[in-house]
Amino acid sequence: MINQVYQLVAPRQFEVTYNNVDIYSDYVIVRPLYMSICAADQRYYTGSRDENVLSQKLPMSLIHEGVGEVVFDSKGVFNKGTKVVMVPNTPTEKDDVIAENYLKSSYFRSSGHDGFMQDFVLLNHDRAVPLPDDIDLSIISYTELVTVSLHAIRRFEKKSISNKNTFGIWGDGNLGYITAILLRKLYPESKIYVFGKTDYKLSHFSFVDDVFFINKIPEGLTFDHAFECVGGRGSQSAINQMIDYISPEGSIALLGVSEFPVEVNTRLVLEKGLTLIGSSRSGSKDFQDVVDLYIQYPDIVDKLALLKGQEFEIATINDLTEAFEADLSTSWGKTVLKWIM
């Protein structure tokens, strides 16, 4: 079977390429239905990654957030028509200590390997997680970002002290919003504070205990642990504010990605006995755990709906370009692609 793959060949330039797919291979064949654009995709699209990185990784199909429908499974594990969320991280070995998303041998779709912008995606069976029938697929398209947050929370739980009465979240964007949703469900008795700089973004966090502007933090405010969801150049000031306000022996979970090294007040980290926990991407278990949370707490999906921005029907390469360009001017939420190529 001929498969069409839509690749970024140069900044702002998509082209279609073709490969031959063996439908009787060991993979399950999934037709993408809805996808969502990530900031990492935009760094490739706009050419803002390092030139050496771009030359090594392009041409490449973008997008690592998406849901689809099983069209064929020669192994019979999935029924035709089963809706699944697609897992972008693909391990090539198993390690009893190191998680799959930290193994150097693992590869990640839309980061040196083709992403989900294809007519058909071939997945290992454990890279497809079944979804409930009655769920809104357009909202669930950005589940991968939810798994990144849950993975960070699970890592934090293993490495932090038992005091978990108060949490601070730095970042009023998509990742901060998702992290707040999950912490509210997982720690219903704890207080959650969100720190940001944009009023209309902070207004979405109606379910937390309080929100603060980063330049108007009350004197004497403190919390047990913190989650950094800022990234970019702003992560430096965010991390150092967390260090200033966090209680002794607290943990700071770092989720934001910065293209540049940041300076950290290590003197205060040592003085307070703080733990900094790095976290990146997620694995298939995180996806299954998130889907289980959707089923257990349907209101999580309702809250995630507030993140849905523009939805574009993608039938041509011009539609793709239009969607990526529009997403660049989106200050809140996720751009969704309805895949009808």
From Swiss-Prot:
Pathway the protein contributes to: Cell wall biogenesis; poly(ribitol phosphate) teichoic acid biosynthesis
Top-level taxon in the UniProt lineage: Bacteria
Keyword annotations: Cell wall biogenesis/degradation, Metal-binding, NADP, Oxidoreductase, Teichoic acid biosynthesis, Zinc
Cofactor: Zn(2+)
MF-aspect GO terms: ribitol-5-phosphate 2-dehydrogenase [(NAD(P)+] activity; zinc ion binding
Reactions performed catalytically: D-ribitol 5-phosphate + NADP(+) = D-ribulose 5-phosphate + NADPH + H(+)
Listed GO biological process terms: cell wall organization; poly(ribitol phosphate) teichoic acid biosynthetic process
A Pfam family that the UniProt record links to this protein: ADH_N
EC number in record: 1.1.1.405
Binding of Zn(2+), residues: C38, H64, E65, E144
UniProt cross-references to PANTHER family, sorted A to Z: D-GULOSIDE 3-DEHYDROGENASE (PTHR43350:SF19), NAD-DEPENDENT ALCOHOL DEHYDROGENASE (PTHR43350)
UniProt subunit comment: Heterodimer together with TarI. Can also form a dimer of heterodimers.
Described purpose of this protein according to its UniProt entry: Catalyzes the NADPH dependent reduction of D-ribulose 5-phosphate to D-ribitol 5-phosphate.
Entry similarity comment: Belongs to the zinc-containing alcohol dehydrogenase family.
Protein name: Ribulose-5-phosphate reductase 1
UniProt lineage: Bacteria, Bacillati, Bacillota, Bacilli, Bacillales
Gene: tarJ
